[in-house]
Amino acid sequence: MDLYPPPIVHPPRCRLPVLLSVPHSGRDYGEAVLANAAQGRLSLETLEDPLVDRLAWRAIASGFAAVIQPVPRAVIDCNRDEEEVDPAAITGISPAPVGPRARHGLGLVPSRTHRHGRLWRRQIDRSELVRRIEQVHRPYHIALSAGLETFASIYGEALLIDCHSMPPRAHGQPAIVIGDRHGTSSAGWVSAEAANLSREAGFRVALNDPYAGGAIVARHGRPHAGIHAIQFEIGRESYLERDGRTPSAGFDRVAALIETLATGLGQALLDRALPAAAE
């Protein structure tokens, strides 16, 4: 049985304590996964945040650290807790109360979507779930933790920007949503400054509505310890053509914004940390 690929880790090459996370852009579907897809590959691709890994290229080229998940969200969702399992989708799992996301098919292993219905021909064996957790989910979070802890030990502060995309918004709706779990995963000034930088770049922005942040920012954000985590959601209409897969004329603009956020927020963290260290 082949191993799942490890997360792609880009080490820092600049002196700003910012780590980018891209958990939902994996496109590495194995033969076994596709063979079990009840509605074909397209049904699994609808779970992706298309090309968000490529949106991060400018920031990575500028030296920012990043962790990118090559394994598709359909296989296992790194933005869910290990316990968010739909027992109807996994064999050998005892029925237990589940959260609303797992109940609606979008738990640790997605089982159905509103558009395509049931995703899998057969239930996934519990041993396979354990394999995915051990080879995909945990290594991703270990890489995030290691990067953030290293930054915090060097600079006294660290920031995680967890990058996602959202379905096209209606005309006039914000193209960007910044999530900080209602002030629990980052200091309020961090998300406020992220919103300001996005507005200065010409985007309409909302805070925590409708996406307040998932398991990644909830797990890794510890603002009381100087480790901040925000979720960045960009509307797909801002960087993709109408087919939802092809980069549009706005692609480079969004890539530039991610670099701007990393630079501006990273410098702001250092500016705040230095006076505190001198006291």
Tell where the protein language model's regions lie, with residue ranges.
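N-terminal catalytic or cofactor-binding beta/alpha core of small enzyme domains
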Residues: 1-160, 166-230, 234-279
